[in-house]
């Protein structure tokens, strides 16, 4: 009688443990480089995949010198509209989240940084210069 009772207990314990682990799925992606349309699309698809798989959150490891404003805005909008919490982790050691990366990090549900990483320099940069006011 002790063996069947122990077997039932073991089965229940395994079932409960698998339910706990199934509820704690976490997505992970890495973004390393300039922010552009491909990055915005990649992040948007990853958020949709995390939602479809009922993940607890999506972790984005970020290392970027910045990028395009339009792509940054799309990423921020996808974070703000996401039913899945987004965690931005600036890493590895020595990584940066400057310019567009700063805005992306600050828009996340949770922002975290590895030791010796940097964030900042968040201002628009003109690539083509300003048109002249006339001939001189």
Where does each model-flagged region fall?
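Bacterial N-terminal signal peptides
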Residues: 7-17
